[in-house]
Amino acid sequence: SDIAAGFISMKYGFMGPNYCTVSACASSNHGMIAAFDAIRYGKADVMVAGGSEAAVNEPSVGGFNSMQALSTRNDDPQHASRPFDKDRDGFVIGEGAGALIFEEYEHAKARGAKIYCEIIGGGASADAYHFTAPHPEGKGAMKSMRDAIKDAGIKPEDIDYVNVHGTSTPAGDIPELKAVAGVLGDHVYNVNISSTKSMTGHLLGAAGAAEALACIFAITHGVVPPTINCENLDPEIDPNLNLTLNKAQKREVRCALSNTFGFGGHNSTVIFRKI
């Protein structure tokens, strides 16, 4: 499973820490946290981290289908990924990749690198609950977010945007929103929340990298990406939450928090800040 990282190191001559993180759909978030740790602990000046996935094939589709995790809107695939909608019925497999260069700040300045933002915190936890279902009250997700906020040295009130895992599954969306509200308290009504999986599908192991990039561009462009395809909000969801439904919203984003979770109860959170 480490051939992807090994190939990149050989192609570009990277001789620092080199391995693949394997934690289902949380993998690339965990990889970014590992890269962040390597730099701040003085083990590297520059790290490349990300993820890739090409899962539109018979084994992957068959496996997830047997778990009843996939949407069955086969006649309307463009609208099948619909986080927070009362008629959501599972996720849509996406394919893609994303990679980010993490670099010690003074090192980046010295070489004149273009700096988009800074990563300031990472958190990880386990649900210790079920192989495929999240904890119904989002306990593991709350721990991951709280640990990331503590690691970043900020307050919940500093968060402007949350890119949720939001896979469009009946079991997953609401516990995550409960967790976000539990962590942010009343400030949850001041933040934008969205699931970019509504547009990309679920990139599985690459989800964290792709969604980190969505957060970074929200910071650099001052535009929060939307949650599309939500036509009828699930009645169990607080209607006062700003889920950035169906249209991007302009706002200053100083701090963005990104969640990715994986089967097996793997939870991970990264936080980026404007610089």
Predicted stretch roles:
Residues A54-S81, G123-K143, T167-V180, A206, ...:
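Active-site-adjacent elements of ketosynthase-type condensing enzymes
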Residues S1-A34, K43, S66-V92, V180-A209:
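Conserved catalytic cysteine-centered active-site region
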Residues I8, S28, A35, F64, ...:
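Conserved small-residue
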Residues D75-A152, Y161:
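Condensing-enzyme catalytic core mediating Claisen C-C bond formation in acyl metabolism
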Residues N18-S23, A44-S52, K114-G122, E157-V164, ...:
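Beta-strand segments within the central parallel beta-sheet cores of soluble alpha/beta enzyme folds
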Residues M10, L100-E104, K150, A181, ...:
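Short beta-strand-to-turn element immediately C-terminal to the catalytic PLP-Schiff-base lysine
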Residues S1-A24, S52-V61, P156-G172:
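Conserved beta-ketoacyl condensing-enzyme motif
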Residues A152-D158, Y189, D238-I275:
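Flexible, low-complexity linker/loop segments at domain and module junctions
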